[in-house]
From Swiss-Prot:
The lineage of its organism: Eukaryota, Viridiplantae, Streptophyta, Embryophyta, Tracheophyta. Belongs to the MBF1 family. SMART domains: HTH_XRE (SM00530). PROSITE patterns: HTH_CROC1. Keywords: Activator, Cytoplasm, DNA-binding, Nucleus, Transcription, Transcription regulation. It is found in: Nucleus, Nucleolus; Cytoplasm. Disruption phenotype: Plants are deficient in basal thermotolerance. Residues 91-145 form the HTH cro/C1-type domain. Residues 102-121 bind DNA. Binds to TPS5. One of its GO terms (molecular function) is DNA-binding transcription factor activity. Induction: By abscisic acid, H(2)O(2), heat treatment, dehydration and high salt, but not by cold treatment, 2,4-D, ACC, methyl jasmonate or salicylic acid. Transmembrane segments: none annotated. This is Multiprotein-bridging factor 1c.
């Protein structure tokens, strides 16, 4: 039978040294391992985790923090902007021209029917992503120059 390798076949007789795998961090936290390290004089650092195991939300820097005292001192109510009347009327008009129900529109823009109802009733806080989806499906401008 011919060999796949041209020339003489040689053996690899160099020794292969197998090492034990490094200890995992879980094993290093074991009290036995910590006590053994202390007996050998190795420096051991122990750190207690802060709020470990609790279900508290961390403070995010992305969301602005509103001081409740400042809110109480303000005379103006902190109300969010709602959908303008002309926008909600354009949504209703364009939807009815296409002979779509609110559920059909909601299904096409991948939103709940309640979202479409809120936009048409003027109760929704304008979301650019939702308005863009509605513009695409209805074929009407709802942002900027409305109705064109």
């Amino acid at each position: 039978m011919p060999s796949r390798y041209p020339g003489a076949v040689t053996q690899d007789w160099e020794p292969v040294v197998l090492h034990k795998s490094k200890q995992k961090s879980q094993d290093l936290r074991d009290p036995k391992a910590v006590n053994a390290a202390l007996r050998n004089g190795v420096a051991v650092q122990t750190v207690k985790k802060f709020d470990a195991g609790s279900n508290k939300k961390g403070k995010s820097t992305a969301v602005p923090v509103i001081n409740t005292k400042k809110l109480e001192e303000e005379t103006e109510p902190a109300a969010m902007d709602r959908v303008k009347a002309e926008v909600r009327l354009m949504i209703q008009k364009a939807r009815l021209e296409k002979k779509m129900s609110q559920a059909d529109l909601a299904k096409q823009i991948n939103e709940r029917t309640q979202v479409v109802q809120e936009y048409e009733n003027g109760k929704a806080v304008p979301n650019q992503a939702v308005l863009a989806k509605m513009e695409k499906v209805l074929g009407v401008k709802l942002r900027g120059k409305i109705g064109k």
